[in-house]
Amino acid sequence: MRSPVTPGAAIAALARGPILAALLPAAVFANGLDDFLAFNSATKTATARFEQQVFDRSGKAVETASGTFTFARPGKFRWTYDKPHKQVLVGDGTKLWIHDPDLNQVTVKRMEGAISSTPAALLAGRDDITALFTLKDAGSSDGLAWVEASPRAQDTGFERVRLGLKGKSLAAMELHDQLGGRTLLRFSDLKANAPVAPQSFVFTPPQGADVIEDAPKKQG
């Protein structure tokens, strides 16, 4: 099975603090929810590297992947898997493009509904994140303050998402799906509000690629 689509989005190495930080009591860390809301409000663009691990319901690691991501609010992102298989996901604000070079295939979905209640919305979605997710503090561990986000919509492919913050910077994301599986993303070299080229969110299918586009919803 290929790497799951995660805006998102949503990875090199998780940015951890010095060893002393791991020894400090949880009370020393700032409120995770406050930190996430501050990050969400202040960060309009970002770039980072990521490492991804996929675990089955028994907790066994079944897949690893790595790559980079870029986003610009609202609704634009580029999520690139470099290893073990090349895959590119581009959200241009209107459409979501998923390119699988090995299959010479491009899948096109409407952005509306594709990321509105998915992990991508936590990174590249609109500022009013509480309209899409129920958020709550989830304690501190591994030197990070955690927030749990549960989608308000019922038809998402995941049950909840945990976000790990170090200060007001996102360091990790953990997705729990409906079947008991778990996907852990660890971020590094995250640059908030870095200049991002508009071309990053433009995708043109390669010549000769098989393009599969979702049919628009019927009216009425």
Give residue spans per PLM region.
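N-terminal leader/targeting segments and the immediate start of mature chains
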Residues: R2, A26-V62, P205-G220
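Soluble periplasmic/extracytoplasmic beta-strand elements of cell-envelope proteins
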Residues: T47-E51, T68-T70, R78-T80, V88-V90, ...
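Solvent-exposed strand-loop boundary residues in beta-sheet-rich modules
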Residues: S58, D102-N104, L179
